[in-house]
């Protein structure tokens, strides 16, 4: 059974991270980890995984609006394989279409004074996790 979960919004500049619980079906933004040319700061990601100890990791798969792969899809799939091997957790890929748009909309709704990339990326990870939890 799923315990705690981590969701990742993969990107070439940074990855957004959120945590969640299946029992409550809630997700909370944790923050971001910088990436360098698509390679994450593994030391920072290691710390997050160790701290939250998720049973499963959900990674957003960047597809276009017609569910076709994009330039970044292969990088996200490679990243997901590395995460699975590195942390020995079950990794689930989910279409992340519109997660960033939804995150921006949520921040605007709460009248966030500063819509930063960090907030958007972490909140996009929440959207990814909430979507996955609602489907599972």
UniProtKB/Swiss-Prot annotation:
Pfam families: RuvX. It comes from the Bacteria. One of its GO terms (biological process) is rRNA 5'-end processing. It is found in: Cytoplasm. Keywords: Cytoplasm, Hydrolase, Nuclease, Ribosome biogenesis. One of its GO terms (cellular component) is cytosol. CDD domains: YqgF. GO terms for molecular function: nuclease activity. Could be a nuclease involved in processing of the 5'-end of pre-16S rRNA. This is Putative pre-16S rRNA nuclease. Its EC number is 3.1.-.-. The lineage of its organism: Bacteria, Pseudomonadati, Pseudomonadota, Gammaproteobacteria, Thiotrichales. The keyword Nuclease applies. Belongs to the YqgF nuclease family. Gene3D superfamilies: YqgF/RNase H-like domain (3.30.420.140).
């Amino acid at each position: 059974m799923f315990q705690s979960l981590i969701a990742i919004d993969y990107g070439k500049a940074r990855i957004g991270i959120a945590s969640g619980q299946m029992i409550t079906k809630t997700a909370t933004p944790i923050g971001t980890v910088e990436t360098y040319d698509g390679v994450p700061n593994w030391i920072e990601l290691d710390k997050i995984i160790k701290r939250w100890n998720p049973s499963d990791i959900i990674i957003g798969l960047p597809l276009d609006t017609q569910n076709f792969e994009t330039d970044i899809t292969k990088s996200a799939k490679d990243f997901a394989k590395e995460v699975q091997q590195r942390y020995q957790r079950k990794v689930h890929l989910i279409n992340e279409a519109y997660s960033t748009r939804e995150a921006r909309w949520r921040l605007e709704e709460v009248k966030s004074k500063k819509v930063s990339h960090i907030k958007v990326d972490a909140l996009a990870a929440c959207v990814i996790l909430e979507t996955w939890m609602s489907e599972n």
